[in-house]
A protein has these predicted regions:
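Extracytoplasmic gate region of multi-pass secondary transporters
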Residues: 52-59, 239-289, 294
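Helix-to-loop junctions at the C-terminal end of transmembrane segments
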Residues: 84-97, 291-302
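C-terminal ends and interior cores of transmembrane alpha-helices
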Residues: 106-120, 313-325
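Hydrophobic core of transmembrane alpha-helices in multi-pass small-molecule transporters
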Residues: 124-140, 249, 328-341
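Intracellular juxtamembrane helix-capping segments at the cytosolic ends
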Residues: 141-154, 161-162, 342-355
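Helix-loop-helix hairpin linking two adjacent transmembrane segments in secondary transporters
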Residues: 168-212
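Flexible cytoplasmic inter-helical loops of multi-pass small-molecule transporters
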Residues: 213-230, 417
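C-terminal transmembrane helical hairpin of 12-TM major facilitator-type secondary transporters
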Residues: 281-287, 292-293, 298-350
Length: 417
């Protein structure tokens, strides 16, 4: 009887799960870089906003949409990314990063497949619902799951973890641009969406199998990052949260107002179509460099000073971009993507430094709501002011305002930020 009970215990799901979890924990402790590799594999396929310019023309033609309507597809993806960071953060804190990541893989792949299969031509809102909502939510479920998990395994090197994962996000624009051009030329935009959806689901779901928070000594090390771990309610009552929220919002127009139309804009300013498309590839490489280098710099001089340098650069470069012609369009746009992506890559570590590691996933989600506000609010404001000039001067003013917010952003717990 005793042997029988022992056998049953060994075969029970809980015992099997614990044993499997122990094997995975042992593997991750021995090879912590595998978390970064899995995260990079996921994020290299989630930089949809960076690559949207390669899809925009084909979407306008095949789905019979005006340029402004197609650009709003991009804006709503960013909007629902911010909203999804909260939902994904809550799911991650309750069920762990693997569950949140797998949910994101389903949403991301499903959104692309629905756009390729179900969306009729001439109905913008159908595209927003079938593509923008699930893709934005899917990217959001994946990003904080990967980022928070990596930061916990690399608690003493958060900048390194943030940089590696962020670098993959930056390279994603180049990867998706190449895949998009290759597939659109062979199977059209609908077929391209279907193939990309299947690829994204397969790769992201497989990589999510490695996402697991550390236990034991690694977990204890991750918990030492802050004297206090703020709940969402506590965080929302701080001045630091609202300043950070507006910092995130005010960074958006410098790049996100131009990403959907960068190919057309470069052609209008004297570049051939092939040269104009290189804006996306070179911009993606610059984005990857910014996401890799700026978190490293923030480990050295602090998150706040790093972002202050980047916002000052965004303001100056936005003025230059308003007058850039020819090859200077590529050069200045690439510098803008470097600064914007570098700033964005520092934010997760800043949230952790300000409000603690325990609730980092959902707390980052609330900070990312600033991106939702900026991604919809600034395009609407640009339309009101006049799209061409309005985009540029909104970018300049927003970057200057973001710099002012950073001047007043102070640590929450007496430590350097």
């Amino acid at each position: 009887m005793i042997k029988s009970r022992t056998a049953i215990k060994r075969l029970s799901p809980a015992h099997t799960s614990a044993k499997g979890g122990g094997i995975l924990q042992a593997f991750l402790k021995k090879y912590p870089w595998s978390i970064l590799a899995a995260g990079a594999a996921i994020q290299i396929l989630t930089g949809v906003p960076s690559a949207w310019g390669v899809f925009q023309k084909a979407v306008c033609e095949t789905y019979e949409l005006a340029e402004a309507d197609a650009a709003m597809i991009f804006s709503f993806v960013i909007c629902f990314f911010g909203i999804g960071c909260i939902l994904g953060g809550l799911l991650q804190d309750k069920a762990g990063p693997r569950a949140a990541g797998l949910s994101g893989a389903v949403l991301l792949g499903g959104g692309f497949c629905m756009a390729g299969w179900l969306v009729p031509a001439g109905i913008p809102w159908a595209f927003y619902l079938a593509f923008s909502v699930p893709v934005g939510l899917g990217c959001a479920f994946l990003y904080p799951s990967v980022m928070s998990c990596a930061q916990k395994w690399y608690a003493e090197k958060k900048g390194l973890a943030t940089g590696v994962i962020g670098g993959a996000v930056g390279l994603s624009g180049a990867v998706l641009t190449w895949l998009g051009r290759f597939l659109i030329a062979r199977v059209g935009i609908r077929g391209a969406f279907l193939w990309l959806g299947a690829l994204m689901f397969a790769v992201c779901a497989a990589a999510c199998a490695l996402l697991e928070n550390p236990q034991g000594k690694a977990a204890a090390a991750a918990a030492q990052g802050a004297a206090q771990n703020y709940t969402v309610g506590q965080m929302l009552k701080t001045k630091q949260y609202w300043l950070l929220f507006f910092v995130v919002a005010l960074a958006t127009p410098a790049v996100l107002l131009f990403s959907p139309i960068i190919v057309e804009l470069a052609q209008q300013r004297g570049l051939s179509e092939a040269a104009a498309l290189s804006c996306i590839v070179v911009g993606s490489a610059a984005s990857a460099a910014g996401r890799l280098l700026m978190p490293w710099l923030s480990d050295k001089i602090g998150r706040r000073y790093t972002d202050m340098l980047l916002f000052a650069a965004l303001a100056g470069l936005s003025i230059w971009f308003a007058f850039a012609q020819g090859w200077l369009v590529i050069a200045v746009y690439s510098l803008l993507t470097f600064c914007y992506s570098g700033e964005a890559a520092v934010i997760p570590a800043a949230v952790t430094d300000l409000f603690g590691q325990k609730n980092a996933g959902v707390n980052y989600g609330f900070a990312a709501l600033g991106m939702s506000l900026g991604s919809v609010g600034f395009p609407l404001a640009a339309r009101f002011l006049g799209l061409e000039a309005g985009r540029h001067w909104l970018a300049v003013g927003a970057a200057a305002a973001g710099l002012v917010c950073l001047v007043f952003l102070k640590p929450t717990q007496g430590k350097r930020l």
